[in-house]
């Protein structure tokens, strides 16, 4: 079993990522971020008490997978429950910029 990341360590990761965001991406992050909270995930999340959710946009959640040491995107149907396990090892700023750029591209269509 892995040792889940502490809230203090997670906040350090978030702060580090925020320093890499600027302009519209940072504004977008400030709109979607939430205080970190544990969300349930049925496949792998039980052992660690869930995964830390850090942002919500529509029916999408950004969460930290501390098994794989990276931020991930999932849909959700019930607030507090991650629908799809994901195991990317992405930095938070990459995930935020990916979502933001995807929204910008779709808005221009």
Question: What is the meaning of each model-derived region?
Answer:
Residues 1-40, 79-109:
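N-terminal non-globular leader segments, chiefly Sec-dependent signal peptides
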Residues 30-70:
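Amphipathic, interaction-prone secondary-structure segments
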């Amino acid at each position: 079993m892995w040792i889940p990341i502490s809230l203090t360590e997670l906040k350090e990761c978030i702060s580090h990522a925020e320093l890499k965001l600027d302009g519209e991406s940072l504004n977008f992050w400030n709109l979607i971020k939430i205080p970190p909270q544990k969300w349930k995930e049925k496949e792998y999340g039980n052992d660690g008490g869930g995964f830390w959710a850090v942002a919500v946009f529509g029916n999408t959640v950004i969460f930290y997978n501390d098994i794989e040491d990276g931020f991930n995107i999932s849909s959700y149907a019930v607030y507090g429950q991650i629908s799809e396990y994901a195991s990317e090892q992405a930095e938070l700023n990459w995930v935020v910029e990916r979502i933001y750029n995807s929204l910008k591209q779709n808005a221009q269509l």
